[in-house]
Every structure is written in structure tokens, then in C-alpha cells.
A protein has these predicted regions:
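A short helix-to-beta-strand connector/capping loop
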Residues: 54, 77, 93, 152, ...
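Short beta-strand micro-motifs in enzyme catalytic cores
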Residues: 3, 31, 95, 255-258
């Protein structure tokens, strides 16, 4: 059972009770603390010396209900995703991606993640990708897919330290930790790199802001997802004239767009 405590305050909640603490999900000014055990008493004690912080809500939920995921393996393109290294008997050639979602997003089941995996499978199967950049790494599933598909180096960026912690565990479990570097950041402006491949699967406000900023244009091949079909034309406008749309992969109403430099 996960115990989730919602705190409201400014800055970062430091020196929290660490016994049973799985991680912290930041959505400033709210911070969600995930514990494996009942921790209300030590948290209330922590709050006594911090008058600027409030406990605004708490939730108890089964661990497997955080993402409401089921455990059957999924085959997408050249990948097989699940909690087991054994591929399905009828698809023995698939690359296995072992994923424990922990308490962050990115199990491989969301339609946008599926679309990105299909796009990665397609692009890496026809192009040599040396360096890949995954913006919004989550559990690391897309970064791991890039490494397994042949990228020599993958830079995975996320603003959430809990996501990076989980991504690192998953990278190690998949034997690609030596090719994936994890960076805590919320924008691309702090980097000066020219990757062969760039993938971004995030919510629309962040996608729009990132596309407008323009650093993603340093890449040669691009995959974008996380928006509904109503935003598709806006994405295409950001891409032109430097990039052309190679394909649009749709999964349950969620498009994944693949772009290449013209």
C-alpha cells in the first residue's frame, strides 16, 4: 500500500522523514510524498518546525493502482515491454525492455508511449543513431529503447528526481546504464548538444513551450507525442520549414509525429 501525502510550501521539502520514503513528486507549490508505510506522525512532527509548510491532503492506494497497470507483456515494433525478460513464444526476436514503473509515469502502456516506441523501432531500424536525447524521461522506457536499439549514448532529462531515480534503476536492470546519462532539468536551454535523435513525450503546455524555444531543432530526427489530434497542425507549423513530417502514428486518438530535417 502506498501512503501519499500532499504538502504545500515554497522551495524543496528538505530533511523529510526518510524511513519508507519512496520519493517525491514535485508540482510546485504542491509536493507529493510517497511512502511504503504509514508516516503521518513523523510528517506532522516535521511540520511543527516548518510553519510555511502545510499538509493539505493524504491518500492511501494499492501500489499497483497508482498507474492502474496490468502485467501482461506488450509487443510494440521491435520491443517487448514488461516485468519479465522472456519474450512471447511467438515473437522471440523482440528486444526485451524490463520496466518497473515505481510511482512515476511511463509503464509503456499509455498510447503516447506506445507510439514513441513504434517510432523508435522504425527510425532506428533504418537510420544510424549515435546520440539520442529523451526529454521527459519518466521511468526511462524511451531512453532504454534507444540504447537497446543501437544508440551509443542517450541523454535522458527530467525535472522530477523521483523519475530519474526510477529511470536509473530500470537502465541498470536492462544493462544499458553505461550508455544513458540522466540530467535533472526542466528545459533544453541549459544544454548545447546536437543529437541525431530527439524524443519528447510530455503534456501539451511543455511541448508547446519547448517547440517555441527551438533547441530541439539541433536534432536530425525527431519524435513528438503527448498531445491530442487537435494540436497536430500546431506541431506541424512549428516543424516547418526545417523539418518534414515523415509519419503520424495514432494510438487511441493520440498522435505520435516523426520528423526529419529537410
Amino acid at each position: 500500500m502506498l501512503r501519499v501525502y500532499e504538502l504545500k510550501g515554497s522551495g524543496w521539502p528538505r530533511n523529510l522523514p526518510d524511513k519508507g520514503l519512496e520519493g517525491i513528486w514535485p508540482e510546485p507549490p504542491f509536493y507529493y510524498l510517497f511512502y511504503r508505510k504509514e508516516s503521518a506522525e513523523p510528517i506532522l512532527e516535521w511540520l511543527k518546525s516548518r510553519p510555511d509548510w502545510l499538509l493539505t491532503a493524504r491518500y492511501d492506494l494499492p501500489y499497483d493502482k497508482w498507474q492502474d497497470i496490468c502485467l501482461p507483456q506488450i509487443s510494440l515494433g521491435s520491443f517487448n515491454i514488461g516485468l519479465s525478460a522472456d519474450p512471447p513464444a511467438d515473437k522471440p526476436d523482440r528486444m526485451a525492455i524490463l520496466i518497473d514503473p515505481g510511482v512515476v509515469f511511463g509503464s509503456g502502456l499509455h498510447p503516447t508511449t506506445q507510439g514513441c516506441l513504434l517510432a523508435i523501432s522504425e527510425i532506428f531500424g533504418s537510420d544510424e543513431i549515435v546520440m539520442a536525447l529523451d526529454f521527459g524521461a519518466g521511468t526511462g522506457v524511451l531512453a532504454i529503447a534507444c540504447a537497446l536499439a543501437g544508440a551509443k549514448f542517450v541523454l535522458a532529462i527530467d525535472r522530477n528526481p523521483l523519475a530519474l531515480k526510477t529511470a536509473w534503476k530500470n537502465a541498470r536492470a536492462n544493462g544499458v546504464a553505461d550508455r544513458i546519462a540522466l540530467v535533472e532539468a526542466d528545459r533544453l536551454g541549459c544544454l548545447n548538444i546536437r543529437p541525431d535523435f530527439f524524443v519528447m513525450n510530455l503534456e501539451w503546455p511543455i511541448i508547446e513551450k519547448t517547440l517555441a524555444a527551438g533547441e530541439w531543432r539541433n536534432a536530425r530526427r525527431v519524435v513528438l507525442a503527448g498531445f491530442l489530434e487537435s494540436r497536430l497542425e500546431s506541431v506541424k507549423r512549428f516543424a516547418r520549414p526545417e523539418f518534414q513530417v515523415d509519419s503520424v502514428i495514432e494510438r487511441q486518438g493520440w498522435p505520435t509525429v516523426t520528423l526529419s530535417r529537410t
